[in-house]
Structure formats: C-alpha cells, structure tokens
Amino acid sequence: MNAIDTQNLEKHTPMMRQYLTLKAEHPEMLLFYRMGDFYELFYDDAKKASELLGISLTARGKSGGDPIPMAGLPYHAVEGYLAKLVQLRVSVAICEQVGDPATSKGPVERKVVRLVTPGTLTDEALLQEKQDNLLAAVYHGKSGYGYATLDISSGRFVVAELASTEALEAELQRTNPAELLYSEDFSEMGLISGFNGKRRRPEWEFDFDTSQKLLLDQFGTKDLRGFGLDNARLSLQAAGCLMQYVKDTQRTALPHINSIVRFNQSDSIVLDAATRRNLELTVNLQGGHENTLASVLDNTATPMGSRMLQRWIHEPLRNQQQIESRQSALTEILDTNLFETLEPQLKALGDVERITARLALRSARPRDFARLKQAISLLPEIQQSLANCQSAHLHHLARMLGEFPDELELLERAIVDNPPMLIRDGGVLKEGYNAELDQWRALSQGATDYLSELEAREKEQTGISTLKVGYNRVHGYYIEVSRRESDLVPLSYQRRQTLKNTERYIIAELKEHEEKVLSSQGKALALEKQLWEQLFDQILPKLHDLQLFAQGAAELDVINNFAERAETLNYSCPTLSQKSGIHIEGGRHPVVEQVSQTPFIANPVTLNPARKMLIVTGPNMGGKSTYMRQVALITLMTHIGCYVPAQSAVIGPVDRIFTRIGAADDLASGRSTFMVEMTETANILHNATTESLVLMDEIGRGTSTYDGLSLAWSAAEYLAQKIEAMTLFATHYFELTQLPELISNVENVHLDAIEHGDTIVFMHAVQEGAASKSYGLQVAALAGVPGKVITAAKHKLHHLESRDTNSAVDSMTTSNQQSMVFDEPVNSALNDALDKIHPDELSPRQALDILYELKRLTS
C-alpha cells in the first residue's frame, strides 16, 4: 500500500508537496487536482477512483522508492464522474489552478474551490430531481436524540427531539439522508451502520452555545423562541453541527436558509420504520421505486411537486381542518375539470425551488435565469385559471404564487432566449442591455466593416483579384491569396500559413487589429461577468417571495395531481369522523390493482368500538396481506388529503399505524427472523393506543407450535382487551378463531377459496366468520412441491387431525414418526385404486363395486 508520506515533504517534488499539503486539509475526500486539461488523483485516492469510476491506474514519480499511483480524468467530463461518486456517497474536493502559469515561479498556485459532498449538492446534474437530497446530523444526549435535516437545494431546515432509538430509526427511514453527521462519541453506531454517507465530526461542533450562536447569526434574530425551539437543546446541537458543516463546504452566504421548523410527531400519524418499509410507501421491499404508493399517486407536473408529494406520504396529517382544506381544493379542481387546464401550465414552471436555492448560493447558471424568466412569465396565466375558484385553500395558494413584474422585465431585457450553459462562454446578456458591453462586443467580433474596407483597399493596391481577409481560431486573422497570384504579394506581407492552393499572410495593420479584438474579447467577457453578478444582487431581494412561489406552486401541483389521479383511477372522497373506527366499502389496494393481470376484488372493512379486532384467516395466497395493507394505505391516503380507492370510506381519528408483516433475518445485527418479529411486536405492544391501526400478520411462526400459538394468542388478547387498538390480526393458528367467543370486541373474517378436486381457486373475497381450513397442501402443490411429498403430507395431516392438539404435537416430535413421513405408503395398491377414482363420474352401481374392491384391498 502506498501511504502518503507527509512527514518528509522535502523528499518530494514542489508540485507533489503542493498536492500533499492540500490533501492533508481534506483527508476524508477524494482530491481532484487540476493539471492542465485533467484532474489528477494520487496515492490511495487514485486507487479508489480507479475502482469506483473504472478509470486507468498508472504511476507518476516515486515515494519511498515505490511508484506513486495516479489516475486522471478530463476536466470537461468531470460532472459525469462527480454524479457517479455522489451516487456512491463519496465526497470530492476540487482543486483548481488560480495562479498565472506565465508569472508563477515553481508550481502554479492552486486552491480547493469547491467541495462536493452527497448532502450538500445544488448542481442540477448531480441531484435526483424527484427526491429530496438531505444533509442530516444526529446528537445523543441523556434524554434522547437531537436530529436535524437540511435540504440545501431548497433551504428547508427541520429539527426533531426524539426520545427513543425506535423514534430515531423511524426518522432515519422517513428522511433517508444522503449524508449523516454524527459526533465522535456517538454510542449507537448500530443504528446508523447501514448509511454509506456517514461523516464523523468533532465534539466541539455539537457544543450548545456555539450551535445557538451560529443559528442566531444565520437567522438574524435575538433568540429562537419564534421558531418554537424552546426546550429543544439536543436538536439545536445537531442543527449547529449541520450549519457549521454547510458553511465549511459552501464557503458563501446562505440567505435562503432563513427559518427552521420543529417537527412534532403529534402533528402527524406516527409511522415506525417497519411500517414505512412494509407498506412500500416510496421504496419497495427490493429497494427500488417501482410498484410503490408514490409511483401510483405521482403524476405531478413539476419535480418540486413530486418531492412534496413524497414528504406528504411520509407525514400524514392528524389535523382534520388541514386535511379537509386540501380535500376541498381537490374536489373543486376535480368537479370543474380544472386539472386539465392547470397541468400544462404547471409543467412549464420547471423546478423553481432549486433554481431559487442556486440563486441564493450565487451558483445559478444562465439557463436557470432563463427558466426563472419563463416561470414567472406564466404566473398571470395560472392566477387567471384560479381566479373563479371558491376554495379558500386555492385562494391561499394563488396568493403564495405572487407577482414579479419588475423581475420579469429585468430578465427579459437581460437574458437571451437560449443562453449558453456557462457565463464563461459569454453571449448570455442581450444586445442593448448595456451600451459599453455592446461596444466591446462589436470590436471583439472583428468590426466587419473595417475588415471589408481593408480587403477592398489591399485588392486595389496589389492588383490581386483573389485576395481575401479571413479568421480562424488557430491562426487568427490573415490575408489569403491564391498560389498562382502569390508572386504579386508585397514585401510587407509576412507568410503565416501555406495550404495546397493558397498562401496566407499577415500585415502589421491586421496584426494590430487582431490584438485589439482579442483584448476586447477579454474585456467584453470580464464586463459581462460583472453585469452577471449584479443580476444576482437585483433578484435576491425577492428571495423570500420566490421561495413562497415555489412552495405554493408545488402544493398546487400535488393537489391538482390528486384530482387527476382521482378521475383516472376511480377514487372517491373519504369522510373524516370524530368517532372512533374505520368503515370502508369496496376498498382496493392502490398498487396491486394497477399491476394485477386480473380484475381486483374490492372488499369492505368495519372497525369500531364494538368491533376492534378482526381475526383474519384463509389460505396462503388468498389475499390476507393485501387486504390488511389496503386498509392501512386507504387510511394513510385519507390523511394526506387524497381521494381513496374505495366506494366509500369513513375514517375516524388515527394516531399511529403499525405493521408486523413478513420478516427476514437481520444479518448485520445478528438477529434471526423470529427475533426481528418479536422486536417489532414488542414495539407495537408498548406504543399502540386505542386510536392506533395495527396490522399483525402470522405472529409466532418462527418457533415451536406451542410457543408460537401462545405468543399469538396473548398478543391478540392484549391488543383487544388492554390496548383496544383497531387491529387486523392474520393467522394460521385456527385456535385464535375462538377469541370472539371470549372477547366481545373481536370478530372473525376470512378470505374465501373454492376447492375442486386437488385444485384450489382463490376468490380474494372477504367473508364474515372463520375459514374452514388453510389449504396449505393445495398451495404447496401449486408451488411445484413433488407429488410424493404432497401424498405423504396428506397422510400425516389425516393422522394429526384424528388426534387432539397435544398428541399431534407429540407425534411430530418423535424420531420414528419423523423418519417415516417420506416412506412409501404401506398399502400402495389401495392408494393406487383411490387415485384412479373420479367420484363425479361414477354411477351408483360403479360406486358400490369400487367399495367392495377397496374392502378387499384392506383385508
């Protein structure tokens, strides 16, 4: 391994000493070191970049007698490589040449001018347009955890005080930060071990006094009470570290970070990490984004609307007034078909939210200004579309959009319609915007009239009919003469280039003009950059209004999208009730109905104080898990203000949604499937309330029959009697179907199936009462389990069912019985005869004959 030798810098070349000094300032980042047209990496950085980016690993010079590993990439392709590294949660320090090579003695002066970290991205090319890109910080104190998140690409700054590790785990799942800062002495590393973008920070960055001062300076206030941050010490410490890190990486003012919000769990329905995962809200169980609730609901017109929708899905409201306000706006848009008008108008807005953040950071590019110009030019049209609406919420959103006539006039006067990507390319500002700029540009573009006059004069003086004045980027200005007339060229002409049929020359007058032109190009570009910076100064006073515009447009987009989804997917408006319970008629799973190849079977559910728990039985593959999940998703959709996939739905107060559905070994933590299941069950039993919706699926499968049945029974009993939570409890323990006889608020329902011979048809219809059997053997046969195994299982099942539960358990544990399960049946002739019988095809006489034959075989 080639370790960096920083102790003996004098042994290295001056250039390598410069590199090592800069690298020592950013030890945890890859250092892109600019050398001419390439960024070079050395030592372990080179090895890591070669592995991650697939670029060649070479060597340059030696260190301690060993070649120094080196890898390079062209400067013009750097954004593509940065995008790959950011996806891998790798941070990069970009070092540029800031000195003049012509005047430098020794290595050209270089400086790190940009830090690219996963959580501090603002560049459009590096961001996922439909996902928030969050930087987070966590601090552990005696009373719990402080947690802070910042989306630097929008300025959204949120803190939370969390009392338990479960609450922190849920927040990490909800926010999914791109980069996570933690203190040197953070004690719960197991909680954050799965995050690739972890960054350890010194303890002093979490100091309370330092953090408070940083935040007060940022917001320009005397205290933080106005932000509701009283008694939020831990979250302020996390926020302070986060603010320090952003200042270090951005190295510029952050005016768009002008407020901070405290996230209160009591304002929204609490969803723990397991619930977010099991319901596949925005990420499916395989880690992708297909076939999730968000994928079905998201037909938004703007990227900022898509990001807001995902936040809403993860933060379902509890405030009935806020929910109904969204519903009323949605209903009006739907009833008037306004969504058809608004959708194309909103689509043309683009991503105003992130453009505004780049304006604040002064990193906006010419095309950002062009897009902003287009967006604010559309506002009168959108305002007109909303003018006749009755909904108070739509009027509120219209006011948030605002008006920007002065800024529109400025941008229309300043920015060309199709600007280049970068200001350094020039040609961004319109002709007529600045008289001095126009003059320098005219000169830099070669003063065409002067060149025409020069060409005419030289033709006349020399008598050369083929003489032309031209220009190219390599050789500059020249006088071109055909080869056959080159003998007429005056002595004052100096040959510049020889081509096949022509000669090119330069004269003193043309050389002087060239120098003026090149000088004027530099002056024109310098002035354009100066005027460009002044544009930021003229727009930024409206920063807060632009942020409100982006927020209002995003919310209008989400609600308009809900209206379109309701129309397209046949959703209905749910009713919110103050009475406890959930009543759904014709409910459907919003995702499964979209991907199913067959018509989806809608089902009802009723939960109320007299019917708090439903014991759900039925065959595997019968639809129990789908049924339970759809109840949770319809409830959640109601609380984000969306219409729902049901004929009707009345939803009472809900404070939490819990799911214990499916499990897998947690190998990283060394926990078995059963341990994961029991941990999730414990969390539910400790935290559920009478207003919680609980989904419990197959509790107790991972242990012995006795243990599993006992745990499932006790958990169901505790939920129904002690907590009285609204519960759907799916099980294959048929003993649990006796609970309704013992507990008044428990009922049985089952998913129906029809058996025909050895086949089974799943009806997916929910019926009252318990299932008659589980159809496990039929499902096993459908799955392709060998026929001999199925036959042996039928015999064992018949044997077990003929005895009571205790003897059945005993018989399953005896070694001689275990060894006989897969033996050939003793009387194979009898079994063969039975297999050949088709009862539906027999006459009474044939049936009697077969009965005598079977009796003979058994004798």
Swiss-Prot record:
SMART domains according to UniProt: MUTSac, MUTSd
Family annotation (PROSITE patterns): DNA_MISMATCH_REPAIR_2 (PS00486)
InterPro entries in the cross-refs: DNA_mismatch_repair_MutS, DNA_mismatch_repair_MutS-lik_N, DNA_mismatch_repair_MutS/MSH, DNA_mismatch_repair_MutS_C, DNA_mismatch_repair_MutS_clamp, DNA_mismatch_repair_MutS_core, DNA_mismatch_repair_MutS_N, DNA_mismatch_repair_MutS_sf
GO CC annotation terms, alphabetical: cytosol
Coiled coil: none
Family assignment from sequence similarity: Belongs to the DNA mismatch repair MutS family.
Function comment: This protein is involved in the repair of mismatches in DNA. It is possible that it carries out the mismatch recognition step. This protein has a weak ATPase activity.
Protein name (record): DNA mismatch repair protein MutS
Lineage: Bacteria, Pseudomonadati, Pseudomonadota, Gammaproteobacteria, Alteromonadales
Gene (name only): mutS
